[in-house]
A protein has these predicted regions:
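A cross-family detector of function-defining hotspots
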Residues: 129-180, 185-234
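Short, solvent-exposed coil/turn segments at beta-strand boundaries
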Residues: 35-38, 51-58, 73-74, 95-102, ...
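N-terminal helix-cap/turn-to-beta initiation motif at the start of protein domains
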Residues: 22-42, 53, 123-127, 131-132
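Short, recurring structural edge motifs at helix starts
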Residues: 118-124, 180-185
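N-terminal glycine/threonine-rich, aromatic-flanked beta-hairpin/loop signature
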Residues: 43-88, 173-174
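Beta-sheet ligand-binding and adhesion/scaffold domains
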Residues: 25-32, 44-47, 78-116, 214-222
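Amphipathic/hydrophobic helical signal segments and adjacent flexible N-terminal regions
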Residues: 3-7, 11-38, 108
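Short beta-strand-to-coil "C-cap" segments at the C-terminal boundary of structured domains/repeats
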Residues: 54-55, 111-116, 230-234
């Protein structure tokens, strides 16, 4: 098990840490969860909650963490927790990049903070939408791919692919040649870059993507064969 070291400025939750050997790997002791994921999380039905503190999950003390990837607004970690005096390990992943929808996967159970707010969409499908709602709009996909919590559905006739994280839409692709467009701008993968620049705000050091919405929390990236909508640049 090899530790994934983080770039400078990322993974600031590894504070005051020491490193020890654990299960043929390395564990960061005295670590904390990032403040972005602390607080209350709820499952999709609202019947189950999860409470995360800087050094605890539902009251179980955080004893260390390993296999750290990313950090802050998007990351994953294996957390060693003390539950009734015994050490248990849970994999925790999260994506809280958007203020409109936030997702945390604890083990195999996803939890959410959903507002329902969005700016851009494709045929009514928007970032933060539930998987079942996509099925109701588009039916069963022609192809399914990925491994939970990262799944994707492809619709060949529509020329659209939908990407999910923890059962929530986290990306929408419109392929070249598709007649589908973004609902607000009416643009698609065949639209010229100048049309995107006229409707959306350019972002990035080289204006390599566009942002949408009042809070500029939705990102649109253009490629030769597709255009992508997501909570961050592709």
């Amino acid at each position: 098990m090899r530790m994934k070291w983080l770039p400078a400025g990322i993974g600031l939750f590894l504070v005051g840490m020491s490193v020890v050997s654990f299960a043929d790997g390395r564990v960061y002791e005295q670590a904390e969860f990032p403040h972005e994921i602390c607080g209350t999380w709820t499952d999709i039905h609202g019947g189950r909650t999860l409470e995360i503190a800087p050094r605890a999950v539902d009251g179980d003390i955080l004893d260390g963490m390993y296999d750290v990837a990313g950090g802050g607004v998007k990351g994953a970690v294996k957390a060693v927790l003390l539950h009734e005096g015994q050490s248990v390990t849970e994999k925790i992943g999260w994506n809280v990049m958007s203020p409109n929808y936030q997702i945390l996967v604890y083990g195999s159970q996803p939890y959410y903070r959903l507002t329902g707010r969005h700016f851009e969409s494709v045929d009514g499908i928007y970032l933060g939408m539930e998987m079942e709602e996509v099925r109701q709009l588009y039916g069963e996909p022609d192809h399914k791919g990925g491994t939970f919590p990262y799944l994707n559905w492809s619709y060949e006739k529509e020329g659209v692919s939908v990407y999910f994280y923890g059962g929530i839409v986290d990306g929408i692709w419109i392929n070249k040649g598709s007649r589908k467009t973004f609902d607000r701008s009416g643009l698609n993968a065949d639209s010229p870059r100048d049309s995107y620049a006229a409707y959306y705000k350019a972002g990035g050091p080289m204006n390599e993507f566009f942002t949408a919405g009042e809070d500029e929390s939705e990102y649109i990236s253009l490629y030769e064969d597709r255009v992508c909508l997501g909570s961050g640049p592709y």
